[in-house]
Design a protein with these regions (language model features):
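Mixed-charge, low-complexity intrinsically disordered regions
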Residues: 1-94
Length: 94
């Protein structure tokens, strides 16, 4: 999983533990580890949600000011399906 530069340090510190992604299909899998900094994130869950499920509180938990801010970043390519990805940072990597 890739994160914008401003989100990387909060993810590493454990302040952000979920991400909303708009894809055609999931690009990650539960249990998968993805490099970030000197460690990696391990995906603990992924589930499809609706746009109406993206609340201001969920946007803040994902590291954004609000829903509009999140939606500007969440869309990757032509996808229209919304996924909530939960993860934990593993400082020792993969």
């Amino acid at each position: 999983m890739m994160f914008t530069k401003r989100l990387r340090e909060p993810v590493i510190r454990g302040e952000i533990t979920c991400s909303v992604r708009i894809w055609q299909r999931p690009h990650v899998k539960v249990g998968g580890c993805y490099p970030l900094g000197d460690g990696a994130i391990e995906v603990t869950s992924i589930r499809e949600i609706g746009l109406q499920d993206i609340t201001p509180e969920l946007a803040r938990r994902s590291g954004f000011q609000g829903v509009v801010d999140l939606l500007k970043t969440a869309k990757h390519g032509p996808g229209e399906r919304v996924y909530l990805v939960a993860f934990e940072y593993r400082p020792n990597g993969l």
